[in-house]
Amino acid sequence: MDRAPAEQNVKLSAEVEPFVPQKKNLDAFVLPMALPSDNGSVSGVEPTPIPSYLITCYPFVQENQSNRQFPLYNNDIRWQQPSPSPTGPYLAYPIISAQPPVSTEYTYYQLMPAPCAQVMGFYHPFPTPYSSTFQAANTVNAISTECTERPNQLGQAFPLSSHRSRNGNRGPVVPKPQLLQQHIKNKRPQVKNVATQKETSATGPDSRSKIVLLVDASQQTDFPSDIANKSLSESTATMLWKAKGRRRRASHPAVESSSEQGASEADIDSDSGYCSPKHNNQSAPGALRDPASGTMNRLESSGCSGGVNWPKVTCQATQKRPWMEKNQAFSRGGRQTEQRNNLQVGFRCRGHSTSSERRQNLQKRQDNKHLNSTQSHRSDPNSESLYFEDEDGFQELSENGNSKDENIQQKLSSKVLDDLPENSPINIVQTPIPITTSVPKRAKSQKKKALAAALATAQEYSEISKKSCRKLYQKQLEKTKTPVQLDLGDMLAALEKQQQAMKARQITNTRPLAHPVVTTATFHTKDSNRKTLAKSQPCVTSFNSLDITSSKAKKGKEKEIAKLKRPTALKKVILKEREEKKGRLIVEHSVLGAEEPTETHLDLTNDLPQETVSQEDAGLSMPSDASLSPASQNSPYCMTPVSQGSPASSGIGSPMASSTITKIHSKRFREYCNQVLSKEIDECVTLLLQELVSFQERIYQKDPVRAKARRRLVMGLREVTKHMKLNKIKCVIISPNCEKIQSKGGLDEALYNVIAMAREQEIPFVFALGRKALGRCVNKLVPVSVVGIFNYFGAESLFNRLVELTEEARKAYKDMVAATEQEQAEEALRSVKTVPHHMGHSRNPSAASAISFCSVISEPISEVNEKEYETNWRSMVETSDGLEPSEMEKAAPCTHSPPEKPSRLALDTSLVGKQLPLAAGSITSAPSQGKPTGDKDELKPDDLEWASQQSTETGSLDGSCRDLLNSSITSTTSTLVPGMLEEEEDEEEEEEDYSHEPTAEEVQLNSRIESWVSETQRTMETLQLGKALPGSEEDSAEQSGEEAAEVPEGLESGADSETWTPDQPPKPSSNMGKEHPDSSSPPQST
């Protein structure tokens, strides 16, 4: 035909006659089309059988069309075939009201709107290039008019761009002035059309006549001007026709490539279904249908973004689709779809297309240009080019938005992921996703495994806690409010969770890694992810991609908000003790601050040194309690209640052992460890566990049920303990840095129970790695305290090596402990020698003072020098003024007994002063600081002198009469709680400080006592102890405590018999009694 009227401002190829359908039936989605004959006349209503290759390539035609003749695959007529010879393009034209005939060269069958993909135009191979210009614009107008007239059979307006995409629904095209059409056409030349027939653009920088031999016979210029003038929103039917874009989808890449490469359509066979240059040029008319802002925008952007005119897309889709499907497994739901969408989107007026679609089109085109160009050239003219699938070719028609989303995802996966580093979590997660990217299933499974390992490693080293993950995720949500981003994060989170644990049930563990992905691949997940995941990972795709609120893929009956786990009994104990420790620290600091200034009180002073000692030795923050037994106070584990399995209850409570343990062990090397830690053991354990985990995982991949029945490992104290009771564990690996929880039912008890069971069952138990490292070895993100090995078959060499290393480490540990104990014993001896007499009484380590705390407290008294005991006894007698009345009463009868007894009693009293701290556990003495004042009056200096003389005469301190005087002496000044040996030691110190005053006042005492007092004064001056009274009291209390433990009752009677004579001043003794009557017992400088 001749050029269209100028009014149309559209140059159409005169060679192509508009295709006229046999009859126009609005009800039918696709009607048999009358194809223009070569002479330009529309062939009669009689349908011409379509070549079988066309039918084969396009099997998916709606069968529900009543009007339509269904061609059999054996050359039956599916659409009316144009009379022209195959040389002319075979074009199925959308049923549009007859328009000015288009040259037969361009017979174009446009898709009829149908729920399923409508019949696509098939193009017969047309060897001759299209020389004629585009059909007159009026033809286009007529076509568009018919399209407009044609109701949307589908009831959905399919945007031009969405023909292929399942998102095809678009608003009806709004008619726009033909000027727009003109303008669009002018710009059309700017947009490189894949197939450009000899076209003359009315206006435009690119206006030039191109002769492109596009085998595609579809001519979009055949649309009626009405349609061309209408915008996408107005002409919904046109949009439906534009569904032809599906064909174009396949050809679209070719269109882009050929247009950009400048390849003429002559290069493409007509069979391939490429659009003729007319169609490319007339895609503008198709766009003109959108012509308003839509078409103009699209055409304008078509050069950059779409560039693919609607007819062009159709032709290209037809041609490229087949080979692309072959070449790319994912083309159906993947990039081809994207290309098709891009073409269609571009074909759809840019104004109508969403900004995201335009961007997607641009990106898709950029990504696909190379593919399209190569594919368009590679595409064969045979039926492959015409191969279509309903799902693939018409995804957009069937599912709106699916193909577009898929296209977006494909684009992102190809473009975004390619830019990312290979080891990035996003890349790792995405690699298994594009199943449609022609990746074999085997490769996919391998990638999944590799992904799981990579994710596990990445997250294990990152050690992101769930809280931090949630915070990260919330931040991501705040920053990226787009639902797609949320969906993507959730998808990736689910993927990571599943693969990181290498088990679908562990999806929740790897969620954090999804967050970095959220921002990078925003559009990634809607449909294509959903589809690909549905194939590979059905559990991940259970969520609704349209639901913005669904933050993560759900598995089974998993709750959106995970219900907090109730803490187990062990966890409750751990949490409780943690709180107690915090409280103790606070109380300790406050108590220490209060006690240091108030050392005058015997109780406080007694507690303080023990607190410091126990804290130093045990490393615990718990102050020693006066009510505790000496063993508990001496032990480094003076926490109440002490667990049965704790070291305190397992014989580690001796001072030497406790100091050794505290010196060797630390938080990272707890006391329950009985072997030395070494890198060799750690490496061996790591290899062994990783090997066993790999065995278990391999079995799990093959047969999950069997894998569960034949587990290799078990993690956790609870599980390990349970299986050890069942005698199923072959080896136990314990982390040496478990938290110290010594309360009953706490962590220490659980660990000692495990060790005890292992010893009973003769199971090797190894201390290696830290809790976090142990967790990593078994592919866990959380710390693991204990790992039990059910079966090490297959890794016997590693296991045997581990056992050998462990035995060597135990030997090394024993040697280390022995060496440390020896060193400490030597240090204790040196410290005892250097201790001042008033502090250590110049005796063996049995002085039990706070300084010599680690010495053997229970040293027999027989080893002590007699002189020391005599002097101590005398000093105690001096302080006996402060004896309680009851004690004095008890001591009196003893003293009245024959002289042998009194002498022994006196000696015993002196011994008691020294023994008191040692034996104080047996004595319960009430604070007698106030009482001694009254008691001292009862005691008389004569009796004391007599007792002292007896003691000097006898001179033997065998302790036979310790009973009587011991209790009285101890009770006088020491308020020691029974069993408080350390308190007695403290008393000794205070007695030393205190003793010099009372001794100065006492004049009539024995010469030895006087000498002792002078010596004590000198020592006090040298030490410059401001608190002399308390120190002396401590010493006397120690001595009295020693004897009091042995003879608690005898002291009081002896005290009664011995009463002070009025000649002697009672005050000094009373003062001594008040403050620390035991001052007499403290160390003798002699």
From Swiss-Prot:
Regions of compositional bias (Basic and acidic residues) in chain numbering: 355-370, 933-943
Modification Phosphoserine, positions: 276
Keywords assigned by UniProt, alphabetized: Phosphoprotein
Region annotated Disordered, chain positions: 155-207, 243-386, 615-657, 880-904, 919-1086
InterPro entries the UniProt entry points to: Ribosomal_eL30-like_sf, Ribosomal_eL8/eL30/eS12/Gad45, SECISBP2
Job description of the protein: Binds SECIS (Sec insertion sequence) elements present on selenocysteine (Sec) protein mRNAs, but does not promote Sec incorporation into selenoproteins.
UniProt protein name: Selenocysteine insertion sequence-binding protein 2-like
Organism: Mus musculus
